[in-house]
């Protein structure tokens, strides 16, 4: 099965599929799945000596305001491989803008079926504060050395806002697809 055939999830927006592009703590390489072919491409080598604090991917069949699928940060006990699909639920969203416009990041945990470790985490406020600060720090600085690029981190919002973003992005995708 092609990555292009993966649905957004079983119980959207409560449970979504996330296709992992970048494993947590991986090398400073920005990978992106080509949405037409499903192939994993090197997007760029990051110029800052930083690593992603969580797994990083996207929800298929979505379109965020920046023209890309909705970005998702997935908290797991170990790094996931690029191209893996994981069933998640949103616990919050980091509101951000960058040189391309609105660039929110959904914060998600694996569904209870995959791991009971995260069932008590219902909102971003249940996530260890140090991890939230690490995520914010990463996104505030990961483009620092890239000319013409910038990021403004605007803060965390809860799971309701994250689910609204997921629903809006699916509607946007379906509207464009027609």
Curated annotation (Swiss-Prot):
Function: Catalyzes the hydrolysis of inorganic pyrophosphate (PPi) forming two phosphate ions.
UniProt similarity note: Belongs to the PPase family.
InterPro entries: Pyrophosphatase, Pyrophosphatase_sf
Enzyme Commission number: 3.6.1.1
HAMAP family hit by this protein: Inorganic_PPase
Keywords: Cytoplasm, Hydrolase, Magnesium, Metal-binding
Highest taxon in the source lineage: Bacteria
Quaternary structure annotation from Swiss-Prot or TrEMBL: Homohexamer.
Keyword Cytoplasm: yes
Molecular function GO labels: inorganic diphosphate phosphatase activity; magnesium ion binding
Residues passing through the membrane, by range: none
Biological process, per Gene Ontology: phosphate-containing compound metabolic process
Gene Ontology cellular component annotations, sorted alphabetically: cytoplasm
Primary site of residence: cytoplasm
Reactions performed catalytically: diphosphate + H2O = 2 phosphate + H(+)
Annotated compartments: Cytoplasm
Record: residues binding Mg(2+) 1: 66, 71, 103
Stated name of the protein: Inorganic pyrophosphatase
Record: residues binding Mg(2+) 2: 71
Residue sites binding substrate per the record: 30, 44, 56, 142
UniProt entry tagged with the keyword Transit peptide: no
Cofactor(s) recorded in Swiss-Prot or TrEMBL: Mg(2+)
Enzymatic class: hydrolase
């Amino acid at each position: 099965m092609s990555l292009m055939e993966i649905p957004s999830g079983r119980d959207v927006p409560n449970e979504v599929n996330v296709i992992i592009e970048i494993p947590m703590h991986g090398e400073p390489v920005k990978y992106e799945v080509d949405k037409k072919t499903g192939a994993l491409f090197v997007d760029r080598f990051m110029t800052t000596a930083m690593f992603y604090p969580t797994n990083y991917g996207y929800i298929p069949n979505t379109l965020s305001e920046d023209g890309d699928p909705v970005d998702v940060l997935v908290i797991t006990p170990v790094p996931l491989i690029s191209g893996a699909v994981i069933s998640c639920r949103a616990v919050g969203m980091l509101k951000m803008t960058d040189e391309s416009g609105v660039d929110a990041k959904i914060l998600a945990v694996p569904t209870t079926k995959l791991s009971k470790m995260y069932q008590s985490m219902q909102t971003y406020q249940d996530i260890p504060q140090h991890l939230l600060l690490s995520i914010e720090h990463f996104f505030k600085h990961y483009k620092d050395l890239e000319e013409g690029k910038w990021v403004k981190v605007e803060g965390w919002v809860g799971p309701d806002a994250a689910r609204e973003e997921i629903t809006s992005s699916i509607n946007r995708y379906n509207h464009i697809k027609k």
